[in-house]
Amino acid sequence: MKEKALILVLDDDPDICIMIKMVLDYYGYDAMDAENEENAIKIILSNHVDLVIMDMLLSGADGTDICRRLKLDKETSSIPILMFSAHPTAKETCLAAGADDFISKPFEMNDMMEKISFFLERKKIGQE
């Protein structure tokens, strides 16, 4: 039996983490959350994380720096990263940092789920 995909939600707002995790659970995914870079890296390196969803702006950290770090590391470079922000010019910044895609806040959960499904399916095909 195939395991459920594991998705890491990285945001310093616990309410957003809870909301996204509830939606992911509803759609049959396993989800973990982290509120900072240190916890996120520990989770990614100690679990088989299939996708990361993260805010561009975090307390004490820049999501784009975390994204760059993950994409430059051989162990984590293949993990799809979906970033989000309410900042008007954030999309270009996030994509330039290596994010695989971007969602503007506020976002519709259906839009987020479509992007997640796309990246997980693409990753699955690449592993076959």
For each of these PLM feature ranges, what is it?
Residues 17, 59, 77:
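The feature encodes the CheY-like receiver
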Residues 82-84:
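Hydrophobic/aromatic residues positioned on beta-strands within the core alpha/beta folds
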Residues 42, 64-77:
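Short amphipathic alpha-helix used as the core "switch/output" element in two-component signaling
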Residues 55:
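Active-site residues of response regulator receiver
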Residues 65, 87-103, 111-114:
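Alpha4 helix (beta4-alpha4-beta5 surface) of REC/receiver domains from two-component response regulators
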Residues 33-51:
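Acidic, metal-coordinating helix/loop segments flanking the phosphotransfer/catalytic sites
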Residues 36, 62-65:
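Acidic catalytic/metal-coordinating carboxylates
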Residues 14-32:
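Two-component/phosphorelay signaling modules centered on CheY-like receiver
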